[in-house]
Amino acid sequence: HGSTKWCPSPDAAQKYACCHHGMATYVLGSENEMPWKFDRAYKSDITHVMDEMKLHYTDKYHVEYKISDMTGAEVTDIKLESSVVFEPGLGKYGEGRAWIEPVTSAVRIRKNLNDLSGDELILRNYIKQMTKDGSYQQIAAFHGLPAQCPSEDGTTVHTCCLHGMPTFPHWHRLYVALVEDELLSRGSRSGRPYWDWIDPFDRLPDFFNDATYYNSRTLHIESNPFFRGSMSFANTLTDRDAQDVIYNNH
């Protein structure tokens, strides 16, 4: 965050310790999930910050952090120890010393849902197959309801998602892989698409907001499985109530 280097003020009249913002991490959760736990620092790539400050990882600098809740109030009762880990790059220098990034993607490429081709939109058909045989609901239950994970003392049953725990990234990686393996077994050639909701938008994507879609295989207009789903344990359908605050919000 800071270093022994000094940066001039805009008018060059004073000098300040150089300070660059490195990263921000959000921890989610709800009253239905397992207890919120934050007992270690999250790992994040700060290579770009080191480059901007022209720092080598062995140089003298220090890292500062601030923990706040979603209202902006600072959380002061959690003390974490930060550290910097150097991991050599996996790429290589090519012709003209141009850096070549390594190929790390698998056969199943996860694309932005706004960039899906017409052929890839057939993903709806595979999801519909999963909803019909119950496999989609089984996987969804591992993330949400019905709650299946008991507390340590056995008095409470929580939903199994780990949003408020440091192990969440690992859990979610396995969860996405579980969905993609199910799609692959049904003939899907693409990975599970993602919605980049960080980009400002004025309406929900048609991919999951349209109630129906044209199925090019059956040549019929059919219900969109991403629009509404069945919850057999509650004998009801899912509903969506998008709040205006999400639109055009940076």
From Swiss-Prot:
Q: Which UniProt keywords apply?
A: Copper, Disulfide bond, Metal-binding, Oxygen transport, Repeat, Thioether bond, Transport
Per UniProt, location of the 2'-(S-cysteinyl)-histidine (Cys-His) cross-link in this chain: 19-21, 161-163
Please give the residue ranges the record annotates as the region Unit C. 1-106
The set of disulfide-linked cysteines is 7-18, 149-160
Q: Name one Pfam family in it.
A: Haemocyan_bet_s
Q: Cofactor note from UniProt?
A: Binds 2 copper ions per heterodimer.
Annotated residues for binding of Cu cation: 1, 21, 143, 172
The prosthetic group or cofactor this protein requires is: Cu(2+)
Region: Unit D, residue numbers: 107-250
What InterPro entries does the record point to?
A: Di-copper_centre_dom_sf, Haemocyanin_beta-sandwich, Haemocyanin_C_sf, Tyrosinase/Hemocyanin, Tyrosinase_Cu-bd
Keyword Repeat on this protein?
Answer: yes
Does the entry feature the keyword Repeat, yes or no? yes
Which one of the record's GO molecular function terms can you name? Answer: metal ion binding
Subunit note: Decamers of large identical subunits (390 kDa), each containing 8 globular oxygen-binding functional units.
What family is this protein classified in? Belongs to the tyrosinase family. Hemocyanin subfamily.
The function of this protein is: Hemocyanins are copper-containing oxygen carriers occurring freely dissolved in the hemolymph of many mollusks and arthropods.
Q: What is this protein called?
A: Hemocyanin, units C and D
UniProt source species: Sepia officinalis (Common cuttlefish)
